[in-house]
UniProtKB/Swiss-Prot annotation:
GO terms for molecular function: tRNA (guanine(37)-N1)-methyltransferase activity. It is an enzyme of class 2 (transferase). Specifically methylates the N1 position of guanosine-37 in various cytoplasmic and mitochondrial tRNAs. Methylation is not dependent on the nature of the nucleoside 5' of the target nucleoside. This is the first step in the biosynthesis of wybutosine (yW), a modified base adjacent to the anticodon of tRNAs and required for accurate decoding. InterPro entries: MeTrfase_TRM5/TYW2, SAM-dependent_MTases_sf, TRM5-TYW2-like_MTfase, TRM5/TYW2-like_N, tRNA_Gua_MeTrfase_euk. This is tRNA (guanine(37)-N(1))-methyltransferase. Its EC number is 2.1.1.228. One of its GO terms (biological process) is tRNA N1-guanine methylation. Belongs to the class I-like SAM-binding methyltransferase superfamily. TRM5/TYW2 family. The keyword Membrane does not apply. Its main location: mitochondrion. The keyword Methyltransferase applies. Keywords: Cytoplasm, Methyltransferase, Mitochondrion, Nucleus, S-adenosyl-L-methionine, Transferase, tRNA processing. It is found in: Mitochondrion matrix; Nucleus; Cytoplasm.
């Protein structure tokens, strides 16, 4: 694996952090400011769908309205007052300071208001000249109202707020309409703003007030007292969310919002920084697979010049990701790992501002506070030995992910083993079929996604993988999940050898291997349930079934034919030569095989069964097929299939006939591999529930 591509012909990559400046912008928004705070439930319910929506931007703010003098001394009229909406003070000292900013100015205006009220005490109360004190500010979506519509002249000194309007229960509708029309005529409000306030008033007034006022009651002192009662906020005991009975003071203001890369989703950022319109071959990145702290993407050739930018965008938008890798080639290694490049890595300090990065407390192994097991320490010590360079050892630790799946913990050396998070549902489905007392033989186990949860469930496990790193980390994961040593056995051998030794000894009771002999002698390791065999290597798993093929009944072959026959016998001889000491009644003929394969045929079910039969050497009768399942889509025309079956009666008859002392030698059953499933016999069909949820691609 390489940390960077070595193709000299590739275009120079953009600087990863440069995209942040390109997406930085400011936006001026219209905002609705109101008092009292008790009206929040009702107002926010009415404004639902009308508020500004942007990632990491609060659309409802707590503000303190502070009136300040515009600089024209000697005047206390409202036209000479500018209202600033500040953040609430963090402590009492700041609160006192902000409340004293314009104490003298506020006293002058209050005296003028009281004098005006005395001269005309019989008229309905007028709204205040400006808001003051604690308020709520709601940022409006530009499609509802733009700041430029409120204040066409951006240099206007009075661009701070509009007149205050009194809305809600107890306020005559005619009076509200009159005030809004006056504001329209004087240019204080645009039509869209007036319509919004009219809608707010009608919705707020729809709640039945404690008293109804009409124009005829304006001169009634008792009605004036009732109006003041309506305008007063309800007591906390009578307050209900979404309902408010009383008057609300409302005005409009502007708010400048700065937008950075933190305010956009990953798809939005990629559409902004990648020239998707200019380059027809450059398509939007659909997503990525996350394994622990590692994000895995499959970039096309058109994406490669922007690989570092794509990696940085993924890091910026996903705090749990600290490394981004790109798959370079298809899986071709016998160990099933794939070549990858690191296109993004979260540093311990941000390169731009020096701030500690999000993943600064994540170690190179991708852990956050988890203690290492003894087995894992041994593996790390081995990797840090002279066999590996320091850079390679660090790379291996950095690409070892900590994954939790279905209640189990896994260490996954992602660059050295095969792991597919999209198979999570399939792991749970198959393990869900097993019961305590069952025995699982996992022929291609990887790091144990089938084996570990099965063992944790009380299933005795024999897990094998040809990849020595996978076998090492299976032991790590067994210790990490505190599995008993006598219930979890790890092997590192070829799959055919595992089938011909460990599985054969267990099914027939031959117990030829020392490990199996020791295990079966333990009372807790006897199979009291069912044996399961999983072969989860869909590209070639069916080919391993050739160990069960019958021997050729041709007695004499010549030249090259004899050589080829000898090779075939070496593969499948074990399952065609039953030892004399084996008791036929002790053979478990109910062992259930779960074999995975790929299919692109129109009839997926029939094709999956044909693949099994062609490599097994026997036709599967309907009673031998328990389930044929489509696991997931791999490509538009390619599916991953699972055939669950038992070995057919013809196989067992052939095996028993091969035991010394029986009449006749091993024979080939009449049902050859060319035969299809009997007419009208259909296997059980069940489509995985996860099929609709899993994305395409390996």
């Amino acid at each position: 694996m390489s940390a960077r591509p070595t193709d000299a012909s590739m275009e120079p990559r953009a600087v990863p952090h440069s995209y942040r400046k390109r997406v930085h912008s400011t936006v001026e928004l219209a905002a609705l400011v109101y008092q009292p705070l008790e009206a929040s439930g009702a107002l926010l319910s009415i404004l639902r769908g009308k508020l500004y929506h942007q990632r990491n931007v609060r659309s409802v703010l707590d503000v303190v309205a502070v009136p300040t003098d515009t600089g024209d001394q000697g005047h206390s009229a409202a036209s000479k007052v500018r209202v600033e909406y500040l953040a609430p003070p963090s402590n009492k000292a700041n609160r006192n300071s902000s409340s004293n900013i314009s104490c003298a100015l506020r006293d002058d205006i209050q005296r003028g208001s009281r004098a005006a009220a005395t001269c005309n005490s019989s008229s309905p109360p007028t709204p205040p000249a400006f808001l003051e004190g604690c308020c709520k500010m709601c940022l409006l979506d530009p499609t509802v109202l733009e700041a430029a519509e409120l204040w066409p002249d951006p240099t206007s000194v009075t661009q701070n707020s509009t007149p205050v309007f009194l809305l809600g229960a107890g306020i005559p509708g005619a009076r509200v309409t009159q005030q809004l029309e006056a504001a329209l005529q004087t240019g204080q409000l645009p039509r869209k703003a007036a319509d919004l306030l009219q809608q707010l008033h009608e919705r707020l007034a729809a709640s039945p007030p404690s008293v109804s006022l009409t124009e005829n009651q304006d001169g009634d002192p008792q009605a004036q007292d009732s109006l003041r009662a309506v305008a007063a906020p309800p007591s906390p005991s009578s307050r209900k969310r979404g309902s408010y009975v009383g008057a609300v003071e409302v005005t409009f203001a502007s708010r400048t919002v700065e937008l950075s890369y933190r305010n956009y989703t990953m798809s939005e950022l990629l559409s902004m920084v990648l020239p998707l319109r200019e380059d027809a071959d450059l398509v939007a990145l659909s997503g990525f697979e996350q394994v622990g702290h590692i994000a895995h993407v499959n970039l096309s050739a058109a994406h490669l010049p922007y690989a570092d930018v794509i990696g940085q965008v993924i890091l910026d938008c996903n705090e749990t990701v600290s490394v981004v890798v790109n798959k370079v080639d298809a899986i071709s290694s016998v160990f099933r790992e794939f070549k990858m490049n690191i296109i993004g890595e979260r540093r311990r300090a941000d390169d731009l501002g020096g701030d500690v990065g999000v993943g600064a407390n994540v170690s190179d192994s991708g852990e956050v506070g988890d203690s290492l097991t003894a087995e894992e320490k041994a593996v790390i010590a081995l990797e840090a030995s002279s066999l590996n360079s320091p850079a390679e050892a660090r790379l291996n630790r950095m690409l070892t992910a900590a994954v939790r799946q279905h209640g189990c913990c896994f260490r996954v050396p992602y660059n050295r083993v095969y792991w597919n998070s999209r198979l999570s549902f399939e792991h749970a489905r198959l393990v869900g079929q097993m019961r305590p007392g069952d025995v699982l033989f996992d022929v291609m186990a990887g790091v144990g996604p089938f084996a570990v949860p099965a063992a944790k469930k009380g299933v005795k496990v024999f897990a094998n993988d040809l990849n020595p790193v996978a076998a090492q980390y299976m032991k790590v994961n067994a210790e990490l999940n505190r599995l008993p040593a006598n219930s979890f056995h790890v092997f590192n051998m070829d799959g055919r050898h595992f089938l011909n030794s460990v599985l054969f000894d267990s099914i027939t009771g031959a117990a030829a291997s020392k490990i199996e002999a020791t295990a079966t002698s333990h009372p807790g390791c006897v199979c009291t349930g069912r044996r399961h065999v999983t072969m989860n290597l869909p590209a070639v798993a069916v080919e391993f079934l050739d160990v069960f093929q019958p021997l050729s009944n041709t007695s004499s072959l010549a030249g090259e034919q004899q050589s080829n026959a000898a090779t075939a016998v070496a593969v499948n001889e074990r399952w065609n030569r039953l030892p004399a000491h084996v008791e036929p009644n002790d053979i478990d003929q109910g062992t259930l095989f779960h074999v995975y394969s790929f299919s692109a045929a129109e009839d997926l079910i029939a094709d999956a069964v044909r693949q099994v039969e062609a490599n097994l050497g026997y036709t599967l009768p309907p009673e031998s097929i328990e389930e044929v399942l489509m696991v997931r889509d791999v490509a538009p025309t390619k599916r991953m299939m699972c055939v669950s079956f038992t070995l057919p009666p013809a196989f067992w008859a052939n095996l028993l006939a091969s035991q010394p002392g029986n009449d006749g030698a091993s024979f080939t059953h009449a049902e050859t591999v060319s035969a299809l499933v009997e007419e009208g016999a259909e296997p059980t069909i069940k489509r995985a529930k996860a099929d609709a949820l899993l994305t395409r691609g390996v």
